[in-house]
């Protein structure tokens, strides 16, 4: 809630997602779409949920896209795809899966074995995001641009 509602203040300060978007747009620039799914995965790993990751980070992704002149809808979609990957390594999901198959106490092994598929997934998602935004010139469907 603090991250999401940080723009509601008496000092007219920008919200944390907007400030983070400005920093990322200035430092990473046009290659950011490659990393957008990884941000979603990090959010899901921390929050333990694709939905909560999207709630926390969609404003950040959308603003970053706007600052870079890219499709906000595509960037938020990349966020969601990455958050799905992050669910594979979310701790409570690893614990639940380990308990279900009788591997209690071996969560670390399960997590290590899940990391490689997660990384492949994120590399593919980042590459496809770059291809869609730059190679195919897909614009923002919400604004009917191309």
Indicate residue ranges for each PLM-predicted region.
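Flexible loop linkers connecting adjacent transmembrane helices
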Residues: 10-22, 104-107
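Alpha-helical transmembrane segments of multi-pass membrane proteins, especially transporters
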Residues: 14, 33-36, 40, 54-59, ...
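Hydrophobic alpha-helical transmembrane segments of multi-pass integral membrane proteins
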Residues: 1-8, 26-60
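Transmembrane helix-loop junctions in multi-pass membrane proteins
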Residues: 1-16, 46-47, 130-140
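Short amphipathic alpha-helical coupling elements at transmembrane boundaries
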Residues: 18-26, 62-67, 109
């Amino acid at each position: 809630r603090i991250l999401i509602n940080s723009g509601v203040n008496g000092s007219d300060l920008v919200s944390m997602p907007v400030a983070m978007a400005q920093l990322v747009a200035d430092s990473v620039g046009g290659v950011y779409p490659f990393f957008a799914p990884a941000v979603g995965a990090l959010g899901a790993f921390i929050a333990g949920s694709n939905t909560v990751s999207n709630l926390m980070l969609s404003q950040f992704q959308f603003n970053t896209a706007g600052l870079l002149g890219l499709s906000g809808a595509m960037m938020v979609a990349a966020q969601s795809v990455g958050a799905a990957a992050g669910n594979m390594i979310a701790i409570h999901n690893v614990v639940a899966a380990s308990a279900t198959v009788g591997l209690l106490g071996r969560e670390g092994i399960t997590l290590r074995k899940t990391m490689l598929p997660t990384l492949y997934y994120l590399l593919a998602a980042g590459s496809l995001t770059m291809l869609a935004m730059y190679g195919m010139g897909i614009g923002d469907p919400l604004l009917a641009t191309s």
